[in-house]
Amino acid sequence: MSSSSYEAASIKEIFCSVQGEGPYVGVRQAFVRFSGCNLNCNYCDTNFENLGTCDYEIIEGNGIFEKIPNPINVEKLESLLQPFKKLHSVSLTGGEPLLHADFIEKLKLPVPLYLESNMTLPEQARKLRENITYVAGDFKLPEALREIRPETRDMHVENTIKCFSLLKKNKLRDCFCKIVVGRDTRPETVVLAAEAIASDVSCIILQPETPVGSAVRTPRFTQASVQTILKLQKTLLELADTRIIPQTHRMWGCL
């Protein structure tokens, strides 16, 4: 791997684990967690603030990290990923990796790139249409963005639909949609979202909301019932392949 670039990015973590969400659950990946996000979702379980250093897993899977100074340039990241072997792909996550599209565009790796995105930055997504093999795109429902003004929520929904259209499935790229379903999720909102992107994706994942913070002790206050999610799946199956898959890495206790 070689690349020359003056681009650099603030990265929070680099480590090896397995994909814990969606249709590729269980595949071995290197994870590059970028700092920074343009949203503030109610159920977010990730600290994505910019830090002066990046936590880098010294030996894949051993959970022992060393501090690497930020920002990290493209060539350095390629070098840091070299020791991780037998990978299905490299997951670009965050935060929001599309904030770093110019950086990602210059990456040259021997394995495919797997983008985990909130799908609200279409101009950034446009830059990566030829670079990404797997798109794990979220559809952030308006009720998940309660702290954002209503007009801004509408803009995010429009931008999400644009992103799915730009990064839609084709012969060289898989694209699927993940929708987090919680107690306050309105089924009619999920159906509208699914209708808007069904033709662009290989499947829709309904992900039961994972309790975070104090909600861990009282999950019934944040989680939708099994019956509710099953009923929603039945409706969406009229539009696209729809699966119910919780966050498996939380069950296993891995990163």
From Swiss-Prot:
Mg(2+) binds at T46. Its cofactor is [4Fe-4S] cluster; S-adenosyl-L-methionine; Mg(2+). [4Fe-4S] cluster binds at C37, C41, C44. It catalyses: 6-carboxy-5,6,7,8-tetrahydropterin + H(+) = 7-carboxy-7-deazaguanine + NH4(+). It comes from the Archaea. Catalyzes the complex heterocyclic radical-mediated conversion of 6-carboxy-5,6,7,8-tetrahydropterin (CPH4) to 7-carboxy-7-deazaguanine (CDG), a step common to the biosynthetic pathways of all 7-deazapurine-containing compounds. This is 7-carboxy-7-deazaguanine synthase. It comes from Methanosarcina acetivorans (strain ATCC 35395 / DSM 2834 / JCM 12185 / C2A). The gene is queE.
